Amino acid sequence: MKIVLTPNPYRDRNFKHVEQAVSILQQSGVETKICLPFDVDRNFELPGDMNFCDLNKEIKNADILICFGGDGTILHASKIATRYHVPILKLFFDECFI
């Protein structure tokens, strides 16, 4: 099984939620790929220790997409996921949760 995770880097700046999900899924033997659902601003620094994959490439053979963020994040990710009929699980985090 392959799961693609798409975090919103502006909401979860240190990616702690997606890293927790990756850890749990990989312990269960699931292949995971972290992909950004949209391009980030030029001045925004992404963590150098994380490997971000191309969503357009990874979604093609994914079993599910887990989207971390709000409505805008899921709209970006769903544009690509629906082309390949990949189901989407949305996990919403409001400001007080992060």
How would you name each of these model-derived features?
Residues 1-64:
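ATP/NTP phosphate-donor binding region
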Residues 10-13, 40, 50-98:
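Small-residue-rich beta-alpha loop regions that form the catalytic core of phosphotransfer
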